[in-house]
């Protein structure tokens, strides 16, 4: 026998983000468009795009040009690289190959370098017209973890806590136990 959680007055949380917190009208239109595409096509690609577009800004990690180039190979060289975040420039990358990239935003220098190499910078509405089911598209995401996450969670020093304290220095005399006297 199972418990009827709703009857007991317990709150059952939804695991899926239903609506975006963004107030940007264009962003909301994109979500509306991809909701339509998810409903009309049986494409997992569109479901992924919709989920990532609906995620919070904190979870849209910027993707650098060097990471895009690093993930290129012979099979996906002609494909459209898709990212639901900002594409940023990387000055350590000396040459940029010809790319077709679709993203929410591009930094000014990243856009210049892609266009100078003979590539294209697409928006999501252009991608929906070009590939409504996501054929010939390669979905990329930046690494999710950030240095800031080290400090979140239980307070440092509490039992069971693995979070790092905010300290001005990490030397011998800072935030270290001096031992018993």
From Swiss-Prot:
GO terms for biological process, alphabetical: translation
Entry-linked Pfam families: Ribosomal_L18 (PF17135)
Annotated InterPro entries: Ribosomal_eL18 (IPR000039), Ribosomal_uL15/eL18 (IPR021131), Ribosomal_uL15/eL18_sf (IPR036227)
GO molecular-function term, one example from the UniProt record: structural constituent of ribosome
Major subcellular site: cytoplasm
Stretches with biased composition (Basic and acidic residues): 169-181
GO cellular component terms attached to this protein's record: cytosolic large ribosomal subunit
Renumbered residue ranges of the record's region Disordered: 152-181
Keywords assigned by UniProt, alphabetized: Cytoplasm, Ribonucleoprotein, Ribosomal protein
Subcellular location per the Swiss-Prot or TrEMBL entry: Cytoplasm
Family of this protein: Belongs to the eukaryotic ribosomal protein eL18 family.
Name of this protein: Large ribosomal subunit protein eL18
């Amino acid at each position: 026998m199972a418990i009827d959680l709703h009857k007991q007055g317990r709150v059952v949380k939804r695991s899926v983000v239903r609506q975006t917190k963004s107030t940007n009208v264009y962003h909301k239109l994109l979500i509306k468009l991809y909701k339509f595409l998810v409903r009309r096509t049986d494409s997992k690609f569109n479901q992924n795009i919709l989920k990532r577009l609906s995620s919070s800004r904190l979870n849209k990690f910027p993707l650098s040009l060097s990471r895009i180039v690093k993930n290129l190979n012979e099979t996906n060289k002609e494909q459209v690289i898709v990212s639901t975040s900002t594409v940023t420039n990387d000055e350590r990358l000396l040459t940029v190959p010809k790319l077709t990239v679709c993203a929410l935003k591009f930094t000014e220098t990243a856009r210049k370098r892609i266009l100078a190499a003979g590539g294209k910078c697409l928006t999501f509405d252009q991608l929906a017209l070009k590939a409504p089911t996501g054929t010939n598209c390669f979905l990329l995401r930046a690494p999710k973890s950030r240095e800031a996450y080290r400090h979140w969670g239980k307070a440092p020093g509490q039992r069971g806590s693995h979070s790092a304290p905010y300290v001005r220095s990490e030397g011998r005399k800072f935030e270290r136990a001096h031992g018993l006297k």
